[in-house]
Amino acid sequence: QQVPGZKETKIKVPIAMFGGSGNYAXALYIAAVKXNAV
C-alpha cells in the first residue's frame, strides 16, 4: 500500500522541476514508474 502523502510528494517534485505545465507529463512518468515497480 502506498501512503497518500508519499504520492503527493512524488508528484510535487517533478512539478517543481518542470513547472505547472509539466504536471501531465509528471503524472505519466509517475504512472510508468509505478507500473515498472509493480
Curated annotation (Swiss-Prot):
Subcellular location: Mitochondrion; Mitochondrion inner membrane
Cellular component terms per the entry's GO annotation: mitochondrial inner membrane
Parts forming coiled coils: none
Principal subcellular localization: mitochondrion
Gene Ontology biological process terms, A to Z: ATP biosynthetic process; proton transmembrane transport
Keywords from the UniProt entry: ATP synthesis, Hydrogen ion transport, Ion transport, Membrane, Mitochondrion, Mitochondrion inner membrane, Transport
Family, similarity comment: Belongs to the ATPase delta chain family.
Function: Mitochondrial membrane ATP synthase (F(1)F(0) ATP synthase or Complex V) produces ATP from ADP in the presence of a proton gradient across the membrane which is generated by electron transport complexes of the respiratory chain. F-type ATPases consist of two structural domains, F(1) - containing the extramembraneous catalytic core and F(0) - containing the membrane proton channel, linked together by a central stalk and a peripheral stalk. During catalysis, ATP synthesis in the catalytic domain of F(1) is coupled via a rotary mechanism of the central stalk subunits to proton translocation.
Self-association and partners: F-type ATPases have 2 components, CF(1) - the catalytic core - and CF(0) - the membrane proton channel. CF(1) has five subunits: alpha(3), beta(3), gamma(1), delta(1), epsilon(1). CF(0) has three main subunits: a, b and c.
Protein name in the entry: ATP synthase subunit O, mitochondrial
Organism taxonomic ancestry: Eukaryota, Viridiplantae, Streptophyta, Embryophyta, Tracheophyta
